[in-house]
Amino acid sequence: MAIRVQEAASLRLDEIYRYTRDRWGAEQADRYITDLFAAFDQIESHGITSRPIPAEFGVDGFYFRHAHHFVYWRRLSNGDIGIVTILHERMHQMDRFREDLPK
């Protein structure tokens, strides 16, 4: 099992890093991104609590909260875990999630 960061999630990680770096410095940005990846690694072992994505999103998958962000993921057809997107708690999540779904 591998963790696959999908394109939209990769773009969100870049945005999170830049925002955090610009606001609180590179050390904090590095720590936050490292912590996010550590959380990704805990998905398979259930070291973090994930919840099913609500039916109104129209996609099978799960999400968990990490600090001020929600991480959305799903099991890929080969069994790997796909990180679909990462959204800030203030974002209108339903619209952003639909925008970030792979086409």
Give the positions of each predicted feature.
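Basic, Lys/Arg-enriched alpha-helical interface segments
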Residues: 2-61
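Compositionally biased, intrinsically disordered low-complexity regions enriched in proline and serine
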Residues: 18-20, 33, 63-64, 71-74, ...
